[in-house]
């Protein structure tokens, strides 16, 4: 018997597991492959517009993503630095090896937390309340609370060209039966889609034909509780290239060969992260589109071709990649593909992320219809906190829209619902001038302390900052300035 079972070891599952275990509750994290804990199956980055502020909020509440990004990144920069403070946020290139390794260490070193390799095929529900799970190896495990964080693995299909087969990211085994179990208990599901671009061999790129994109020249960090110590001059650069008329012609001449336009895909994809086919078809007035060449690992030789998600067959992916500057001789190491998966109708959730239909059942991440590691981690943290608070017979943590981007995210999911994978944007937050990068700790650390995830050491750091701000404010209020008219002085 565990107090909490978390199903899925992605970013939502990791934050949920850590939150429950650190609050003292016996927690079982079940994942199909322990090697894929906190995996980044798509872009090798943490943060971005609005998302970077969410990572700061996760950190302020006691989550792990922010600190892990700080100690795992290849480069980091402040986006929108020339614009107003309401839209500034951090984005880093994360090392796809180091980030998961650090997360696994944190999980293994956390008391009350057990990790098990298996897949869940059925929920045990009695009188509309969770009792436990049955795994695909037919093991029954009891629990008081269950948090589902299956990401894109639920009844997943991989699609490329005219080919379609069951599979999760990286060819991993999908979760084939849990979706049926959820529907059997009255949970409404929907079909969504996302995709990933090809990867190319670093040594096969002609970087002289590309534009270099460096990290910022000042020390930056997601975490509010640690000083950054990385070497600014050793940040790994990204590079920028563009599609062109040849690229566009190849796509337009072969739309019938890609999964997206051949009718093979039924799931709805993310509006704000479209495939390259969608970009060319929907924005025919554009002569070119930005393509980012992003390193996946410090010591690896694979480059992520950002902005080039595709469902074209392999031979056409070769032609498309070779049509762009810097990539004429590029060697593709992994081909792009789309993935379709089942997701819960988020209108069936409470603001606590607990199911309205099944007591003790929570869900977080892409199963709730979101896209992005940051949105997933934020939901996982809140679901973990609220499952724990429920075990303690306490009221759930409900963040308001004027308190946090996390509050905007959850409120949108629960009260507006989604028809496509949801992505956080600054434009979604009507209080964005209050929900800034620089004040995430001032907004949320007291809440993190109250729910039991901010320890004494972190709280001391926070209180010292608050006292210093107060002293500075008092100093400014008590300081007078005499303005001398320059003309009178002459």
Residue ranges with predicted function:
Residues 71-105, 190-359, 363, 367, ...:
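Mobile, glycine/GP-rich and aromatic-enriched active-site lid/loop segments adjacent to catalytic centers
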Residues 18-124, 137, 149-166, 173, ...:
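Conserved N-terminal/central alpha/beta ligand/cofactor-binding core
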Residues 136-145:
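Core beta-strand elements of the Rossmann-like FAD/NAD(P) dinucleotide-binding domain
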């Amino acid at each position: 018997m565990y107090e909490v079972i978390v199903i899925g070891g992605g970013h939502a599952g990791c934050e949920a597991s850590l939150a429950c275990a650190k609050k003292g509750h016996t927690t079982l994290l079940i994942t199909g492959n322990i090697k894929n804990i906190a995996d980044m199956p798509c872009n090798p980055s943490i943060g971005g517009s609005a998302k970077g502020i969410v990572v700061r909020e996760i950190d302020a509440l006691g989550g792990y993503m922010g600190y892990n990004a700080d100690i795992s990144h290849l480069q980091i920069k402040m986006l929108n630095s020339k614009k107003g403070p309401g839209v500034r946020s951090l984005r880093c290139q994360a090392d796809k090896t180091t980030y998961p390794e650090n997360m696994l260490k944190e999980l293994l070193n956390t008391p009350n937390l057990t990790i098990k390799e298996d897949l869940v095929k059925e929920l045990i529900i009695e009188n509309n309340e969770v009792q436990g799970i049955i795994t695909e190896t037919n093991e029954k495990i009891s629990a008081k609370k269950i948090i589902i964080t299956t990401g894109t693995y639920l009844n997943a299909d991989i699609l490329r060209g005219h080919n379609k087969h069951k599979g999760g990211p990286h060819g991993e085994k999908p979760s084939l039966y849990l979706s049926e179990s959820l529907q059997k208990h009255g949970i409404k599901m929907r079909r969504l889609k996302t995709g990933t671009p090809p990867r190319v061999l670093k040594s096969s790129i002609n970087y002289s034909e590309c534009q270099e994109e460096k990290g910022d020249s000042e020390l930056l960090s997601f975490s509010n509780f640690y000083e950054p110590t990385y070497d600014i001059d050793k940040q790994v650069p990204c590079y920028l290239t563009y599609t062109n008329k040849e690229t566009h012609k190849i796509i337009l001449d072969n739309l019938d060969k890609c999964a997206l336009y051949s009718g093979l895909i039924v799931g709805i994809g993310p509006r704000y992260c479209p495939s390259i086919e969608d970009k060319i078809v929907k924005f025919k007035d554009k002569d070119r589109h930005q393509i980012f060449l992003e390193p996946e690992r410090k010591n690896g030789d694979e480059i992520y071709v950002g902005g080039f998600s595709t469902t074209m067959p392999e031979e056409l992916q070769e032609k498309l990649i070779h049509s762009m500057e810097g990539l004429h001789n590029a060697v593709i190491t992994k081909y792009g593909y789309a993935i379709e998966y089942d997701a819960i109708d988020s209108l069936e959730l409470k603001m606590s992320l607990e199911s309205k239909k099944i007591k003790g059942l929570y869900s977080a991440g892409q199963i709730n219809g979101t896209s992005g590691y940051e949105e997933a981690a934020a939901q996982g943290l809140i679901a973990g906190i609220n499952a724990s608070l429920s075990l303690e017979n306490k009221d759930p943590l409900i963040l308001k829209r004027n308190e946090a981007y996390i509050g905007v995210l959850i409120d949108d999911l629960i009260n507006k619902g989604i028809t496509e994978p949801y992505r956080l944007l600054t434009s979604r937050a009507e209080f964005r001038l209050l929900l800034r990068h620089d004040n995430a700790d001032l907004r949320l650390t007291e809440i993190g302390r109250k729910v039991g995830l901010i320890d004494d050491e972190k709280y001391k750091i926070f209180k010292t900052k608050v006292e210093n701000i107060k002293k500075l404010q008092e100093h400014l209020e008590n300081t007078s300035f005499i303005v001398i008219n320059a003309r009178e002085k002459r």
